[in-house]
Regions:
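Conserved, charged catalytic cores of large soluble enzymes
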Residues: 423
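A short, conserved beta-to-alpha structural element at the edge of catalytic cores
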Residues: 331, 452-460
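Short, charged, surface-exposed hinge/linker loops at domain edges
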Residues: 461-469
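Formylglycine-dependent sulfatase
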Residues: 1-412, 420, 429-433, 437-450, ...
Length: 469
């Protein structure tokens, strides 16, 4: 959620306020999408997962949670407040959750329409159009063998047809939108559309043919899989030996890292490849639709994500606060009309730069509240350097760790509450040799810490008074 809110606002989490999952971006927050909408010439739309508001239930320690438009629990569907525009989005069709554990009225209504169109799609799940929404969602969510040993690895073999899976929901709605736009169904001359897939994310649940598309015995484990963390920070050592609760990981839903076998890891990786391949195919169909409907030549296309997955790196899976490269080094592909093609750029950049880049491409002014940098210079010349360093904020409420990370061309430094990481990315790209405790690197550590503290101070919220004195 923090990085998704950063992509919309162009602000750091400590500024826009969504510092961890389970915190809503407040309605009325300024976003770059608002700017495009208010220009009067853009229709703005999103299909899929947005996660600017939480989709958890009112339960346990969160009994007083506010209602969210993105709630994924059927018993609350009748109470959901509908905001329009939604953070600047004219048109929204949502799906919340991950894998087979997806829900939302928009998704369930689409499933019912697909089953009505082709009744055979409902047969594997015994879905009937007369079923209440809650029952349909339950059938989608638990269409699996609960005794399957793969479940302990967050790998799910289920009965949901490819045609009803969340990836298809996002793809089909995006293509339908492009068709409508090309036919003149909207009054605006331009569009912005988010095609946002819930996958890839655990539980890894590739549907149909995608489940067996990659065989575990044919995949390889990461080079860092055998890292025993003797040279890691105390925080990482503890997770390796006991599996502490972190974002996306807790005891009982996954093996302790030190106990993982190569066979286990290959099963998880193979399943993750399956969901990624389905997304690859879906993206290909969306790009084909752009061409088919005559929109390709004048459309900017950006492919990126909100975070990576550790995927077995250093024997860890899922998310942080383990700021290894597999988690933080994410894809960013961009195609612009008549732009340079098939080129790589080595300049540092981050998600916070996306909204300013889009606004500049659209010829819109960049507001003062944004804190990133436009990437237009590297789109004109891949040799350009836009940034010399990147700041990453990650607050982990499970362990009360507020990590701050600075990335430079050569170094990664991460500060925890009472320890840290220091890696030379040029000489140790696999991040196996933590230099934080090596006194011979104190000088560079202090230099990087000063840069980190200076940058953190510079981007922090302005001090505001309620009254003059």
């Amino acid at each position: 959620m923090p990085n998704r809110s950063t992509i919309f606002t162009g602000q750091y989490p400590s500024v826009h306020g969504v510092t961890t999952n389970g915190r809503n971006l407040p309605q009325g927050t300024n976003t770059f999408v608002d700017i495009l909408l208010k220009s009067g010439i853009y229709h703005t739309a999103s299909f899929g997962k947005i996660h600017l508001n939480y989709f958890g239930a009112e339960s346990g320690e969160f009994k007083n949670a506010l209602k969210s438009q993105e709630f994924a629990h059927p018993r609350q569907y009748g109470d959901l407040t509908q905001y329009s525009p939604y953070f600047g989005l004219d048109e929204v069709k949502l799906v919340s959750g991950h894998g087979t554990l997806c829900g939302h009225p928009d998704y369930i209504n689409w499933v019912k329409k697909e089953v009505e169109r082709d009744p055979s799609l409902g047969k594997p799940l015994r879905i009937k159009l007369s079923n209440p929404d809650g029952l349909i969602q339950t059938k989608l969510n638990i269409s699996l063998n609960t005794t399957d040993p793969l479940l302990k690895l967050q790998v799910v073999r289920h009965k949901v047809p490819e045609e009803l899976y969340s990836t298809s929901f996002v793809k089909e709605n995006t293509i339908d939108f492009l068709k409508r736009f090309s036919e003149g169904s909207y009054s605006k001359e331009n569009f912005l559309v988010f095609c946002s897939f819930p996958d890839p994310h655990h539980p890894f649940s590739p549907p149909g043919r995608y489940f067996d598309m990659y065989r575990p015995e044919e995949v390889t484990v990461p080079e860092t899989f055998n890292d025993n963390h003797e040279n890691s920070s105390e925080f990482n050592k503890k997770h390796y030996n006991t599996l502490i609760r972190s974002e996306g990981t807790e005891k009982g839903i996954f093996p302790v890292p030190k106990d993982l076998t190569e066979e286990d890891v290959k099963k998880v990786i193979a399943a993750s490849y399956g969901v990624e391949k389905m997304i690859d195919d879906a993206v290909g169909e969306v790009l084909d639709a752009l061409s088919k409907f005559g929109l390709s030549e004048n459309t900017v296309v950006i492919f990126t994500t909100d975070h990576g997955d550790l995927g077995g790196d250093h024997r860890f899976f899922f998310k942080g606060p383990f700021l290894y490269q597999g988690l933080i080094k994410i894809p960013f592909l961009i195609k612009i009309p008549n732009g340079l093609a098939n080129l790589d750029c080595n300049s540092l950049a981050s998600s916070i730069d996306i909204p300013e880049t889009i606004l500049e491409l659209a010829g819109m002014p960049i507001p003062d509240f944004m804190q990133g940098k436009s990437l237009i210079p590297v789109l004109k010349n891949p040799e350009e350097i836009v940034k010399n360093d990147v700041l990453i904020e990650m607050d982990d409420d499970h362990n009360n760790e507020k990590t701050r990370t600075l990335i430079t061309d050569e170094w990664r430094i991460t500060v925890f509450s009472d320890h840290g990481d220091l890696y030379n990315l040029k000489e140790d790209s696999n991040e196996l040799n933590n230099l934080w405790y090596d006194t011979s690197f104190n000088e560079i550590k202090i230099e990087l810490l000063l840069k980190l503290f200076k940058k953190s101070s510079k981007i922090s919220k302005s001090v505001l008074r309620d009254c003059g004195f």
